[in-house]
């Protein structure tokens, strides 16, 4: 199902959010109002590092295959978990191979050039929606919604690339 592909493509972030709330991968600063992409510090050894992501992809593919009995769909679900990591290595935070002390990988554009990172994410989102729409008839409303979520969703964060949300809305000094 389409929703399963959307879930798989963002599963690492959902795992990170759960671990951030539980504590092991808590960001600094902890309040969304005090954070900008450039100023946010994250350590995601369980949700985003290379080896744990491969494990998450295998579990995701296995679960999808067991639930829907569709090998192709299962491979897509597992593959989307890995594609998420690949995209993060280009435009997201720096990650490591295994843990805090292992070699860093990725361009770390959220810290080094957050505006560029968000534009790259929006362009990738547009390319994915275009590719998806060319594979079959997509109702106009769904197409608009997909562009809004994947392109608009990335561009929406441009103001917070370097300015914390609380300062943008006058809630913090």
Protein language model regions, located:
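N-terminal membrane-targeting hydrophobic helices
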Residues: 1-173
